[in-house]
């Protein structure tokens, strides 16, 4: 199981939101690149980056920072937030981003998913953000008509190999992950499931490992010091 430290970028800074609310922001660093390098030095094998401004506006906003990250970090970076076209995917992969995450665009534009998966294969990951079991879109501002599991199965049919499953109600709350929902998702699909949202301590890492997810995205708990990255990586092995 891989631990993915999260670097969320808003207005050029490294921040954390609570439940995806843009007015509930805590700034942890003015230098997201340095933050990524810090997690790499501590043993991270992979970095999870979100352009929050991009998620909100529908197109990548923090391109210079993201490009710098891709160049300076020696570990792969997966990026989400505002990726809505094949051209954007191609540009980001050319800049050195390892994987891109399609979220809102996957719900609204299945044709894009089909084309992206056909062209870029494993370099495309589907981000499924759920609120009470329903898929949320547009920076979590709206809820779609899909249940998370139905949507995940649809993405698997289109050729997706990996999904990132986020429980919005837990995100940034340090309330513990929704283990039941994660387990249901793992059992429902035959592709890799990366868990996101609510991780608060080392026990949560152990529990998620037992559920069978292939990776865990950790944000707030790393920034508050409630979770030690090195210990988390050790437990995840």
UniProtKB/Swiss-Prot annotation:
Keywords: Amino-acid biosynthesis, Cytoplasm, Histidine biosynthesis, Isomerase. It catalyses: 1-(5-phospho-beta-D-ribosyl)-5-[(5-phospho-beta-D-ribosylamino)methylideneamino]imidazole-4-carboxamide = 5-[(5-phospho-1-deoxy-D-ribulos-1-ylimino)methylamino]-1-(5-phospho-beta-D-ribosyl)imidazole-4-carboxamide. Gene3D superfamilies: Aldolase class I. It holds the Pfam family His_biosynth. Its EC number is 5.3.1.16. GO terms for molecular function: 1-(5-phosphoribosyl)-5-[(5-phosphoribosylamino)methylideneamino]imidazole-4-carboxamide isomerase activity. One of its GO terms (cellular component) is cytoplasm. The active site is at 8 (proton acceptor), 129 (proton donor). This is 1-(5-phosphoribosyl)-5-[(5-phosphoribosylamino)methylideneamino] imidazole-4-carboxamide isomerase.
């Amino acid at each position: 199981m891989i631990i993915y430290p999260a670097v969320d970028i808003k207005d050029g800074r490294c921040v954390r939101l609570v439940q995806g609310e843009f007015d509930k922001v805590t700034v942890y660093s003015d230098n997201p690149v340095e933050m990524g390098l810090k997690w790499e030095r501590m043993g991270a094998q992979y970095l999870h980056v979100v352009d929050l401004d991009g998620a909100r506006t529908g197109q990548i906003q923090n391109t210079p920072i993201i490009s710098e990250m891709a160049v300076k970090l020696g570990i792969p970076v997966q990026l989400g937030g505002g990726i809505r076209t094949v051209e954007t995917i191609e540009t980001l992969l050319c800049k050195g981003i390892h994987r891109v995450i399609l979220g809102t665009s996957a719900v609204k534009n299945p044709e894009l998913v089909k084309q992206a998966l056909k062209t870029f294969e494993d370099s495309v990951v589907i981000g499924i953000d759920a609120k009470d079991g329903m898929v949320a879109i547009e920076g979590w501002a709206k809820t779609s008509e899909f249940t998370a599991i139905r949507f995940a199965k649809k993405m698997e049919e289109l050729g997706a190999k990996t999904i990132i499953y986020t429980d919005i109600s837990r995100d940034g709350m340090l309330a513990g992950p929704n283990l039941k929902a994660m387990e249901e998702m793992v059992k429902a699909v035959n592709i890799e499931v990366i868990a996101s949202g609510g991780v608060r301590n080392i026990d949560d890492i152990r529990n998620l490992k037992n559920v069978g997810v292939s990776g865990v995205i950790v944000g707030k708990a790393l920034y508050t010091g409630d979770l030690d990255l090195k210990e988390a990586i050790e437990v995840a092995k």
